[in-house]
Amino acid sequence: MLPNIQLDALLDEAGMSHAGLAVRVNRAGRARGMSLRYEHTAVARWLKGQRPRGQVPDLLCEVLGTRLRRTVTLDDIGLGVPGAPAPVHTTALCGFVERAAALWRSDAQQRPHLRGTAPVTGTPAVLPVWEWENPPEDTDVSRGGSCRVGRADTGTLRAARTHYEQMYRKAGGVATRARIVGFLNSGTAPLLRGSYSDATGRELLRATGGLVAIAGICAYDSDEQGLAQRYFHQALRLAKASGDRALGAYVVALLVNQALFMREYRQAVAFAEAALRTAGRELTPALGSDLHAMQGKAYAYLGDAGSALACIGRAEEAAGRIRPGAEPDETGYVQPGLVNVQVAEALLRLGDLPAARAQAVAAAAAPAHDRGRVHRLAVLARIELRQGDADRGVATAVEMAVQARGMESRRLRDRLRDVRDDLRGTRFGGADEAAALIEGALRVPL
């Protein structure tokens, strides 16, 4: 059951309390000969995703429409499809914008019913990728609104994406998420509701898609997997509307990474293949190398060594074609050594420790931003410890723990825990001290 953020947004816009809405619904029901006795607790259940019974959804439209002085439909209040919210991709662009903005608003206000939202699975998880791949396209994204949107506005959004990406890399997604969601709510949603031509609109949608993707990354890093998935699906819809296939492939790569984390390995393989196929000539070497590497990792977890090694070969070939300065901003995360650490994890899963260590050493030796370096050191430390090289493994673990200081990331904490657990199984003089150092870091609340 997903929270009804659209009803929540309209209730806030109407300036009604939960109790006030319940009273008005009861009153509207009496006018139709119905005896209703709803209280604020019922409204709270509706906001959590429970579908009201009988004619109550129509009464909600009537009450909110009267208060807002405009027609309010079942789709507007998130009740157009019985039992589930309307899918992101099957709505007109204007409706999608309002739904996206409703999520940003609820998230910015830290509404409790959004916390712990589970990711969708099955067809709802796959449908956004399928619809990104296939027609119809958005033929005209122009819009008439109260404020005129220009290139300066889209430039601001691109600069904001870079700013929050750097903040995420240095401080982690937990610390960054509230900041970027607040900007989406206050600085981005008004632009999407503004006035712009088709050409400017596509630039605006592309810039917004890049921002929303970073919001999804921060939610993923905060272990809010359901929210992360919703942001990624939004970013994919924005990429499709912008007409930028490469941006869409980048967003699908984020979904591949999340699928790996959630152990949906077949889905990761399929999503990576969809991105590689659909982006075609627009696929850059950096993104191609990452997609092939993650696909190889998924095959490794599925126990298909032949397919994993074939993907690793394609990843390494694509990585050799990366040219600094020739990639879009979004693929800047594919820095030297990233493919090496992805390959190291795949080889580790396949049990080839010597080859995995060689890749991990190469990854750790390459320059990387703070977050990436912690990831690489964690992988290297685990391989060294598994090979029985306790001296090097402990030293690498200590370096990792020191590097991770100041970062608020639940994903990095997972890696810290893995290394700590490996250290506890090591009989070496400094292993206990290194494990205690990591344990101390894990006690700090996020």
Predicted regions and their residues:
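Short amphipathic recognition helices of helix-turn-helix/homeodomain-type DNA-binding modules
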Residues: M1-R24, S35-N134, D414-R417, A436-L446
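Short, well-ordered amphipathic alpha-helices
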Residues: G20-G29, T188
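Conserved binding/catalytic microenvironments
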Residues: G145-L446
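Short, flexible, glycine-rich and Lys/Arg-enriched loop motifs at helix boundaries
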Residues: A28-L36, H40, R323-T331
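Short acidic, glycine/proline-enriched loop segments that cap or flank alpha-helices
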Residues: A31-M34, Q50-R51, A368-H369, M407
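C-terminal segment of N-terminal export signals and the immediately downstream linker at the start
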Residues: W130-R151
